[in-house]
Amino acid sequence: MAGPGEYFAIGAYVSCRTCQETRLQGEVVAFDYPSKMLALKCPSSSGKPNHADILLLNLDYVSDVEVINERTQTPPPLASLNITKLASRARLEKEEKLSQAYAISAGVSLDGQQLFQTIHKTIKDCKWQEKNIVVMEEAVISPPYQVENCKGKEGRALCHVCKIVEKHFIDMENQKGVQRNPAQQSQKETSTSS
């Protein structure tokens, strides 16, 4: 392990033994001294060319660490970040969280919140209007959020939204059935063994 004040240079080749007695060897891609975490780029375990495994190692749990080859060149520059794309992603995440918070504060049922999330995965243009879900400004789903509660302009958009709502509740019922079956099975086993 690196001693006090010692660091692993990015690009250096390192070898070490894990607590499971596995010998690892790879290129250092990151090292955090305070947490003693080392990230190694190793040949792909799948054997695919042009692929690599990135392993995160806690140096408290490895032994026989040795630097095989120090990096002699300066490391390549860091990849540039697309700030516009990152800002857009952050804005969308914030809007989603605010939408969830609004639904909770408005007293929307859990079924309504789950349906909104299901619709939002497929159609981003959906929002809350009090306790109603408004989709593409063409369909409105009011509590208790069933297919018969879908209203709007007749057409493909409303039909599509109704299909999403119907499938959502079928999937929810199937999930509940799967969760109930193990409990029912154990009850049957208990009653037959009595």
Curated annotation (Swiss-Prot):
Biased composition (Polar residues): 176-194
Coiled-coil regions listed in the entry: none
Record has Transcription as a keyword: no
Keywords carried by this UniProt record: Cytoplasm
Residue ranges annotated for the Sm domain, each copy included: 1-71
Protein name per its UniProtKB record: Protein LSM12
GO molecular function, a single term: RNA binding
Location of the protein in the cell: Cytoplasm
CDD domains in alphabetical order: LSm12_N
Domain spans labelled AD: 79-173
Record SMART domains: AD
Keyword Cytoplasm: yes
Similarity comment: family membership: Belongs to the LSM12 family.
UniProt region (Disordered), positions on chain: 173-194
InterPro entries: AD, Lsm12-like, LSM12_ABD, LSM12_LSM, Sm
Function: Nicotinic acid adenine dinucleotide phosphate (NAADP) binding protein.
Assigned GO CC terms: cytoplasm
A Pfam family reported for this protein in Swiss-Prot or TrEMBL: LSM12_LSM
